[in-house]
Each structure stands twice: as structure tokens, then as C-alpha cells.
């Protein structure tokens, strides 16, 4: 499964989200992002996810890294992490 994550930097600060009580890994911290949909590239996926999750229009910057992780159940997660250059709107 391919997923994206956003790194928002403001000086030494970064933005994290806390997973909801009804989600797997409830209460854990994570970077905003989400799953690729069919035909999407990384920046398109992340732009859509940030609008859906946070209500912002983000300018996606450089790809920072792609990391693969295998869960205990054997599912392979491919995480594409991007820098956020700027955004408009107020984070919800």
C-alpha cells in the first residue's frame, strides 16, 4: 500500500495529528497524509488528502524520502514523505 505524509515546518516546530479513538492505533501521533488513489502520483495524493483532512490548499514541495515498512500482518507500506512549501486556508 502506498501512502503519503506531509512535513510542515515552522522554525523548530512541525505539525502532527493525533489519531482518533475510532481509528487503528488510536491516540498515536502521525504526520498528515493518506493513501494513494488509483492513478495518483505522490504530490496529487498529498494535496487531496490535506484538503480532505485539514481543509487547506497546500503547495507540495520536494520529496524527502520513500520508506518501506512491513507490518506484523505482512502488509508492505510504502511511505512517500514531502515537504510542504506553503498553504492557504486555516487548518481545521
What are these regions (language model features)?
Residues 1-15, 35:
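Conserved N-terminal beta-strand and adjoining loop/helix that marks the start
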Residues 2, 10, 57-59, 67-91:
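Active-site-adjacent beta-strand/loop module that shapes the phosphate/pyrophosphate-binding cleft
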Residues 7, 29, 75:
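Residues that recognize and position ribonucleotide moieties
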Residues 14, 22, 69-71:
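Surface-exposed, flexible loop/turn segments at secondary-structure boundaries
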Residues 23-27:
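A conserved beta-turn-beta hairpin within the catalytic core of GNAT-like acetyltransferases
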Residues 31-64:
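The catalytic Nudix box helix
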Amino acid at each position: 500500500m502506498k501512502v503519503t505524509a506531509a512535513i510542515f515546518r515552522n522554525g523548530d516546530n512541525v505539525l502532527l495529528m493525533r489519531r482518533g479513538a475510532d481509528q487503528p492505533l488510536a491516540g498515536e501521533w502521525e504526520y498528515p497524509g493518506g493513501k494513494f488513489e488509483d492513478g495518483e502520483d505522490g504530490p496529487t495524493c498529498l494535496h487531496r488528502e490535506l484538503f480532505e483532512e485539514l481543509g487547506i490548499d497546500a503547495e507540495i514541495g520536494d520529496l524527502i524520502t520513500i520508506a518501506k515498512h512491513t507490518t506484523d500482518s505482512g502488509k508492505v507500506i510504502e511511505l512517500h514523505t514531502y515537504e510542504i512549501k506553503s498553504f492557504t486556508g486555516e487548518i481545521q
